[in-house]
Amino acid sequence: MSERIIMDEAAIQRTVTRIAHEILEYNKGTDNLILLGIKTRGAFLARRIQQKIEQIDEIAVPTGTIDITQFRDDLEQTINQVDERSYEIDVNITNQVVIIIDDVLYTGRTVRASLDAVLQYARPKKIGLATLVDRGHRELPIRADFVGKNIPTAKEEDVSVYLEEIDERNAVVIE
């Protein structure tokens, strides 16, 4: 199966920069702003957005990760749920503006699971959603506030995001 490159390294960098600016505009700066990336690639994108915001405003926004494993509805639930916080960040996110970051928005189920993970232990003032790619085909009424690129796809196509931190290249491809 051949791959079609939709975004190369330069396009991803420009998109991360634009999303960082949009988040700052949305929040009117960095006050009370928290970035939470969904493991795995969303966490790396969150770090990149954090770095861009720091370049723009010279403030390091608190950034963490969300592990949605225990909140997914497509896996058989275990009887003994783990009773520990499913996100990792060094600050309290209650009454903060939390931006959840993912690589690809598809059915909306990953985002729903991330909302469950956050809301189980905290009550943010506001939650926003940023995604590098929105490919459509939603199964839940979820919409991103910050979208890098809308890529209409067929359901049988796969959209893959490759990030240098784990994939040794930066690209968004349709396979």
Swiss-Prot record:
Catalytic activity reported: UMP + diphosphate = 5-phospho-alpha-D-ribose 1-diphosphate + uracil
GO terms (BP aspect): DNA-templated transcription termination
MF-aspect GO terms: RNA binding; uracil phosphoribosyltransferase activity
Keywords of this entry: Glycosyltransferase, RNA-binding, Transcription, Transcription regulation, Transcription termination, Transferase
Residues involved in substrate binding: 40-41, 85, 102-110, 135, 159
Gene3D superfamilies: 3.40.50.2020
Pfam families: Pribosyltran
InterPro entries documented for this protein: PRibTrfase_dom, PRTase-like, PyrR, PyrR_bifunctional
Residues spanning the membrane: none
Motif position, PRPP-binding: 98-110
EC nos: 2.4.2.9
Major enzyme class: transferase
Subunit structure: Homodimer and homohexamer; in equilibrium.
Protein's job: Regulates transcriptional attenuation of the pyrimidine nucleotide (pyr) operon by binding in a uridine-dependent manner to specific sites on pyr mRNA. This disrupts an antiterminator hairpin in the RNA and favors formation of a downstream transcription terminator, leading to a reduced expression of downstream genes.
Stated family: Belongs to the purine/pyrimidine phosphoribosyltransferase family. PyrR subfamily.
HAMAP family: PyrR (MF_01219)
Protein name as it appears in the record: Bifunctional protein PyrR
Source organism (scientific name): Staphylococcus saprophyticus subsp. saprophyticus (strain ATCC 15305 / DSM 20229 / NCIMB 8711 / NCTC 7292 / S-41)
